[in-house]
Structure formats: structure tokens, C-alpha cells
Amino acid sequence: MAPVGAKKGLLERLDAGEVVIGDGGFVFALEKRGYVKAGPWTPEAAVEHPEAVRQLHREFLRAGANVMQTFTFYASDDKLENRGNYVAEKISGQKVNEVACDIAREVANEGDALVAGGVSQTPSYLSCKSEVEVKGIFRKQLDVFIKKNVDFLIAEYFEHVEEAVWAVEVLKESGKPVAATLCIGPEGDLNGVSPGECAVRLAKAGASVVGVNCHFDPMTCVATVKLMKEGLVAAKVKAHLMTQPLAYHTPDCGKQGFIDLPEFPFALEPRIVTRWDIHKYARAAYDLGVRYIGGCCGFEPYHTRAIAEELAPERGFLPKGSEKHGSWGSGLEMHTKPWVRARARRDYWEKLPPASGRPYCPSMSKPDEWGVTKGDADLMQQKEATTEQQLKDLIAKQGIKSN
């Protein structure tokens, strides 16, 4: 195994123009496998089921990922004891973060991958806690990342650039490279700050890599990063670009992204992007100048492999996972059925409009679009579980807003 520090670092790779491939969506993948609870989406599985987390890391590594992101999404102390999710009573936030770092490092050392320690938005910010309090939460995670000597840091999944800036400022205290991504679309963050301005603020706070992750489909994320790039150029601020989108089609989303869709989170399967969609995304991102290209919720290892295969000419090699995957379906030449063998060609898959097989379902949905954000009563943090009356009130609101 390669010793820690022997590999080229993140900025060394990006400065040289190399493509860095991120991994995929751990919370969604592990929820489907039975290791994460939908709702809180917290990562205690790192402690409770380390073998499941380790295996998913390995699958992304085999698919071509250069980064093993620690499974520390929503691993802040306040999130681990929020709305009846009493994880912190059994497993400390420190323990979750430590074990997640160890697993990521173990797998990263099996290949040419870096370890990224990640923090994300907090219930405390949404509850209007002070900058000092919110930064204190990030700093607890950072202490673990420094102790475990991660290679770089990611502030990801922020709906408000203000909180993301606070996270970047804390992570910069480590002296390690920092990447920062917002879960926003072309309309900007939930306070109306444009993507271009968001990118400038993140870069000025100390992020060497800026971009978007989650909430929107691949091509929407590319469009958003294009606006970020334009903002950076106009402000004469330099930063590398990064995209880690959903693996779901979201043309009907509002400002909040896929969380507003009525199918979220248990009926999103008809929206899953194909591996061929990901080829198009990877090429579009690369052509825009993005060099850190990965995925988020819904991204499985075969999606990551599609990025690696599309950009194999630029990278100079294919991932190990391609040993069992013929380029553009060429492996179908071995199929028993002749009509399937006839599909062993690129133009077939590029031109195919996949059917959903659901004749009585709409192709688009109407987003809920409640419009609540930081400071709203329904977003205030509470340790106690949602009460029956609170749930009744929400259902009543839902009925009013739907009408």
C-alpha cells in the first residue's frame, strides 16, 4: 500500500490539469442497502456497519474514483441528536468521524486515491445560532480530520453561502487544501446570492476549489458552475471548479432542488440517470474547464465508472471496473439473443430515449416549494422527536399549499 503523503496532492493534480474523479452518494446508496435511516440521513453506519461503508468505498475506488470522501455527511454533534435521532446518546460524533476517517484511509491506500474530510450544513445554522457556535461545531470535526491527517477538506452541501464561508474559514485553519460546494442551482442560494457571487465569496474565504453538489441533475449543475466560473473571471479571482451532482433528472425542480419534489426520497427511481447520461455530463463538465468531477445522491459506482471511461483519453487509462464493462455496450456482442447483440454499439445507446414503463405516470411533477429557510419555525432545531401535533400541523400546511 502507498504510504500516506507519497501520492500527489489535490492541488498538485489540479494545477497540472489532471482530472480528479470524486466518489458517489453514500447516504442514498447505504439507505437502499439497509444501513442508513432516511430522514436524519446520519452516518453512524461507519461505526455500526464498517464493512458496508468499506465495501462501498472499494466499489467507488474500483470504478475510478481518486477521492475517498470520509462518510461524515451530517456527522456534526447537533445533527446526531436532532428531532428524535438520538445517535449521540450511543455513539459520539467524535467516534463517527474517527472511524469514517480510518475506513476511508484504509481503502484509499489500496489505490491512487486521496482522503477528503467533509463537513456539511448544520441544524444550528438553520436555527439562527451564532457564527461562533456554528464554527465551533465545524471545528470539532476538523480536530478529528487533523488528527487523522486527511489529505484535504471539503465543505459540501450548503444551501446558504454564508454558512459555507464560515465552514471554509474554519477548515482553512488546518493549512490543508479546502474545496467547497453549494447545493444550489442557477438561481443561487436560498438568500438569493447568485452562483457567481457565491463562488467569489467561497474563494476569497480560502477555498481553492469551488462548485456545486447534490440537489440538481448533472447538466443543471454544469450550468450552475458555468455561472460560477463567469463570476470568478469577472472578479479576477482564481479557483479550480468542481461538480458532484445528483444521479436523478430534475428539470421540474424549484430553487430547493429535488427535496421539493413529491417523489423525494422514496420514489425517485424513475428519474435515475443512465450511464450514458453520465458520459455526456462528464464531457460537458470537462469542456467547461471542470477538473474535479464526481457525484452525489443517487450516484452508484457504475455512474462513477462512466465518468472514468468518458475521460479515459484525457487520463490515459481505464479504471479496474472497466475490465467487466465493454465500451459503449460492446460486451453485448457475447449475448445469446441476436437483437441484443445488435445493441452493441455507441449510436444505439446515445440515441435511445429510455421509457419509464409507467404509462399512467406524468413525466414531470409539481414541486412543493414551501419556501422556508433559515429562521423559519419549522426548521428550528429540537432534540425531541417530532410530535403528533407537529406532524398534523405540517400535513395541514401541505394540504393548504397544494391547493
Curated annotation (Swiss-Prot):
Pathway: Amine and polyamine degradation; betaine degradation; sarcosine from betaine: step 1/2; Amino-acid biosynthesis; L-methionine biosynthesis via de novo pathway; L-methionine from L-homocysteine (BhmT route): step 1/1. Keywords: Cytoplasm, Metal-binding, Methyltransferase, Transferase, Zinc. It holds the Pfam family S-methyl_trans. Its cofactor is Zn(2+). It comes from the Eukaryota. The keyword Cytoplasm applies. Binds 1 zinc ion per subunit. The keyword Amino-acid biosynthesis does not apply. Its EC number is 2.1.1.5. It catalyses: L-homocysteine + glycine betaine = N,N-dimethylglycine + L-methionine. Residues 8-311 form the Hcy-binding domain. Involved in the regulation of homocysteine metabolism. Converts betaine and homocysteine to dimethylglycine and methionine, respectively. This reaction is also required for the irreversible oxidation of choline. This is Betaine--homocysteine S-methyltransferase 1. The gene is bhmt.
